Amino acid sequence: MTVRWIDDAASVADADLLVLPGSKATVSDLAWLRDSGLADAVAQRAAAGGPILGICGGYQMMCREIDDPVESSEGLVEGLGLFDTDIAFHPDKTLIRHPDGAYEIHHGRVVRSGDPGWIKTHDSSEVPGGAAFEGNAKGSLRGTHRHGYLEHDANRKEFLRWVADVRGKQYVIDEAASFHAERERQLDLIADVIEQHWDLDALLGEL
């Protein structure tokens, strides 16, 4: 699997999965998407049935309307309209830790949705309004406010199977793969490089 950061419209159609990541400035970043031509490319991909995942701010961009008096001076703006869902920002930030390790930290809240939810909540109190599902799932589109949802091995494997199915491709899941074990391995590699190339005694002596 290869992950690429892209900033050109031509690359949007080629990916098996397009991810619109989190953003601390949803409205202004959405304006950049439009100015760069990426918004049109995202809409074309959605119309063609290409899988798209929006996470937090990326999910908010995929919705119909965004009303943000908290982090933006633009007022009510049109989203990409991929979900029939409206977002309103609230001064009180939503802070939730979910049982699978995923978490939410955002001002934007779903105030109306005409599309099916995606992730079943363990407790209706997890979602403002007591909804039984969080996020949206429509066709080849998925959106959630949850960061780290795919760090949970079972969640990720199920999601990647879905992506492969939508794309009509064979994808063999490594059932033994562990996100947390791999993250620890990568952190150990970074620590080894730092220990090898930095004079830690000198650095610590300055503290």
Each language-model region and where it sits:
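Amide-donor transfer/coupling interface in amidating biosynthetic enzymes
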Residues: 1-11, 39-47, 86-207
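General beta-strand structural signal in soluble alpha/beta enzymes
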Residues: 5-7, 20, 54-55
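Terminal amphipathic helices with adjacent charged low-complexity linkers/tails
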Residues: 12-20
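Residue-level signal for inorganic ion chemistry
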Residues: 18, 56, 147
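Cysteine-nucleophile active-site neighborhood
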Residues: 24-101, 109
